[in-house]
Amino acid sequence: MAYPMQLGLQDATSPIMEELLHFHDHTLMIVFLISSLVLYIISLMLTTKLTHTSTMDAQEVETIWTILPAIILIMIALPSLRILYMMDEINNPSLTVKTMGHQWYWSYEYTDYEDLSFDSYMIPTSDLKPGELRLLEVDNRVVLPMEMTVRMLISSEDVLHSWAVPSLGLKTDAVPGRLNQTTLMSTRPGLYYGQCSEICGSNHSFMPIVLELVPLKHFEKWSASML
């Protein structure tokens, strides 16, 4: 989860988020090098007294500054496309959970079970227990097994919402009348917090998401107790 005064991204807890962090660092380094070069050239232009006004064209220079940016763009595009295809690939999920957005709460249905569904509302600040997080705690957490592929089917019953959990690298729009899907797999147990990331009305800020990733045996006990 995020912390006060945090400058970087949240710690990765899924293979996709790890790839996104690597891509972020890769792209940031390219941008840093280009920015440094541009600032260096600008400083030279402002400080040097040398001028060369007789040059009308320079084919070699024009060729270089056409090819070099194209190569840089390819260096950014190829890793990005690789991650996009990884995020879009869904192979034999172990569990499917249907998520519906409402104004202003989430409802979840475990479609592999006959009658396992619930609504998830934010806990008001006045009802929080010591140690609980303001605007992030819910009355019903989404319990999922760790180290297993989980497919999330996401839609909405009223307006546009967006189901997002940053530490897992997840952000999928919930569109009325449309069923979007994404996958998640956590490499370690824990609580992972997210929020609705699409402005959806006056209580948009009060639609938290809490995922509780647990070992499979604990998930089986929880699902049995909910049925």
From Swiss-Prot:
GO molecular function: copper ion binding; cytochrome-c oxidase activity
Cofactor: Cu cation
Database matches in PROSITE patterns: COX2, COX2_CUA, COX2_TM
Protein origin, superkingdom: Eukaryota
Membrane topology: Multi-pass membrane protein
Cofactor note text: Binds a dinuclear copper A center per subunit.
Any one biological process term the GO annotation gives: ATP synthesis coupled electron transport
Catalytic activity: 4 Fe(II)-[cytochrome c] + O2 + 8 H(+)(in) = 4 Fe(III)-[cytochrome c] + 2 H2O + 4 H(+)(out)
Localisation: Mitochondrion inner membrane
Keywords in alphabetical order: Copper, Electron transport, Magnesium, Membrane, Metal-binding, Mitochondrion, Mitochondrion inner membrane, Respiratory chain, Translocase, Transmembrane, Transmembrane helix, Transport
Topological domains annotated Mitochondrial matrix: 46-59
UniProt cross-references to InterPro entries, sorted A to Z: CcO_II, CcO_II-like_C, CcO_II_C, Copper_CuA, Cupredoxin, Cyt_c_oxidase_su2, Cyt_c_oxidase_su2_TM_dom, Cyt_c_oxidase_su2_TM_sf
EC number: 7.1.1.9
Residues engaged in binding Mg(2+): E198
Binding residues annotated for Cu cation A1, in chain numbering: H161, C196, C200, M207
Family, similarity comment: Belongs to the cytochrome c oxidase subunit 2 family.
Quaternary context: Component of the cytochrome c oxidase (complex IV, CIV), a multisubunit enzyme composed of 14 subunits. The complex is composed of a catalytic core of 3 subunits MT-CO1, MT-CO2 and MT-CO3, encoded in the mitochondrial DNA, and 11 supernumerary subunits COX4I, COX5A, COX5B, COX6A, COX6B, COX6C, COX7A, COX7B, COX7C, COX8 and NDUFA4, which are encoded in the nuclear genome.
Name this polypeptide is given: Cytochrome c oxidase subunit 2
Taxon lineage: Eukaryota, Metazoa, Chordata, Craniata, Vertebrata
